[in-house]
């Protein structure tokens, strides 16, 4: 097990390194001068002053040297300073934003798992029934709907028209922190984030349950007079969950992408909103730092998913 974890960790580090190189190259290919993000447009600067500032920031060095310098600092935990918020470090900005993003993703995935697994089981057990057809149609709609469109539609219906949920933010301004207020703001973004993932989980769960229900040991349990409820819970559910666990781990990356759109629509103060603002203002250190942290989180979750797969099914050996 330890050898497997180290092997996967080394592969993950290689993928993370490749990701940072790709983002660094793409940032260099974007039009414009990075120094523009550091200059106050209301203050006139001579070319000599701009060259001095560029040298101070290390932007006059060759690109490979710039990347290696950034990587060396990142390994030590120093992700640099924001070009737009001069007194704030990138690490500090990420630390203040990663909590809300993790909360949003955890809530969204929890809702998706509950809805997807439950409806998948019902559809499989009640195959070709009205419920089965209804859940299948809803799942198809959920998979086909883009995250940004679902977010805008949910915002319009539940916030603008029905007034059931706040239109944005994480807490009500000028009020003390309270759990009920946080949950009111969290409910709609988390529900919107869960829709596509719940649809995928439902389809996988239904297919896996149908396959497992046709196994010989399930038919034997039924022949012995075991109640259908216990046939599903004790003899079918655990084995049917194996491909779903893999799917849940693989959807973490998709959840990150969905969270970026949803945070921008609902003004949720997380990593997605931070990354979008950094791209808009060409804040390169924040873009690189946020990309590094997001990539590391996705890789770690994928490793944990593989380990969970082995725990659920002891027959599987990780080597």
From Swiss-Prot:
Gene3D superfamilies: MetI-like. Keywords: Cell inner membrane, Cell membrane, Membrane, Peptide transport, Protein transport, Transmembrane, Transmembrane helix, Transport. This is Putative peptide permease protein BRA0408/BS1330_II0405. It is found in: Cell inner membrane. The complex is composed of two ATP-binding proteins (BRA0404 and BRA0405), two transmembrane proteins (BRA0407 and BRA0408) and a solute-binding protein (BRA0409). It is a multi-pass membrane protein. It comes from Brucella suis biovar 1 (strain 1330). GO terms for biological process: peptide transport; protein transport; transmembrane transport. Belongs to the binding-protein-dependent transport system permease family. InterPro entries: BPD_transp_1_N, MetI-like, MetI-like_sf. Residues 98-305 form the ABC transmembrane type-1 domain. It holds the Pfam family BPD_transp_1. One of its GO terms (cellular component) is plasma membrane. It comes from the Bacteria. Probably part of an ABC transporter complex that could be involved in peptide import. Probably responsible for the translocation of the substrate across the membrane. Its main location: membrane. The chain crosses the membrane at residues 9-29, 102-122, 138-158, 182-202, 242-262, 284-304. Disulfide bonds: none annotated.
